[in-house]
């Protein structure tokens, strides 16, 4: 398995946490799919090895409770992170980055969000590099506060940014999101995923084309953006 992991390092250089990507986006590139293994692709085996709590992990650190993810287009994941006590969500993107999606992660869940995205490619042309020309331009890595206010922005070029997080003041006022689940539970109970979990348990695709074929064989519906 080729894993997509987010790694949290402490100031001493030691690994604090490793969070495995929960799921890959499907149906983005006609004729091609990602063949890296996310939790959803091996779900039953993952639960057997690590337990349900590890599906959406939150690392407790001395600077705050931190969750990490490279997942896009699924705000339910970040709401669940907030339910589990996340105070800082670190998100990453390699193109296809929606600035407002990142800002609204903070706005809807009343927490801090960090996003690291591709900057401008100033070197030789890389055929696999996403320039984000259709998404408002490259870069724009940023830090957002609990009400979705931008605290720092890197712009288009590779840049270091920082912002102070008054974690104790934040905790004094912070509450988990207020969700009226009773209204929505009947709808969620009727929903069927586009494809079932565990698609990569028995056989791993060896290429993007094989992953695409496997997706078509298992998908209940197919659409492309």
Regions found by a protein language model. Give the residues of each.
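Active-site catalytic loop in hydrolytic enzyme cores
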Residues: 1-87, 100-104
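Sequence-level detector for tyrosine residue identity
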Residues: 35, 40-46, 50, 99, ...
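CN hydrolase (nitrilase-like) catalytic-core segments centered on the catalytic cysteine
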Residues: 64-67, 71-164
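Surface-exposed, flexible loop/turn segments at secondary-structure boundaries
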Residues: 14, 24-27, 97, 121, ...
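Alpha-helix boundary/capping residues
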Residues: 22, 93, 177-180
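C-terminal beta-strand edge segments of enzyme domains
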Residues: 118-225
């Amino acid at each position: 398995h080729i894993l997509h992991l987010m790694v949290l390092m402490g100031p001493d250089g030691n690994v604090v946490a490793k969070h495995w990507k929960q799921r890959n986006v499907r149906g983005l590139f006609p004729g091609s799919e990602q063949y890296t293994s996310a939790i959803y692709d091996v779900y039953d085996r993952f639960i057997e090895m690590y337990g349900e709590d590890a599906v959406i992990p939150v690392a407790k650190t001395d600077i705050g409770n931190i969750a990490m993810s490279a997942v896009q287009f699924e705000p339910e994941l970040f709401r669940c992170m907030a339910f589990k006590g996340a105070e800082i969500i670190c998100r990453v993107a390699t193109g296809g980055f929606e600035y407002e999606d990142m800002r609204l992660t903070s706005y809807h869940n009343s927490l801090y969000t960090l996003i690291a995205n591709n900057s401008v490619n100033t070197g030789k042309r890389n055929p696999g590099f996403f320039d984000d020309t259709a998404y408002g331009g490259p870069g724009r890595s940023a830090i957002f506060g609990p009400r979705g206010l931008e605290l720092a922005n890197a712009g288009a070029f590779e840049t270091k940014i920082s912002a102070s997080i008054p974690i104790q003041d934040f905790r004094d006022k912070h509450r988990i999101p207020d969700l009226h689940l009773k209204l929505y539970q009947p709808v969620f109970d009727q929903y069927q995923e586009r494809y079932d979990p565990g698609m990569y348990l028995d056989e791993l695709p060896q290429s993007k084309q094989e992953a695409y074929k496997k997706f078509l064989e298992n998908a209940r519906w197919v659409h492309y953006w």
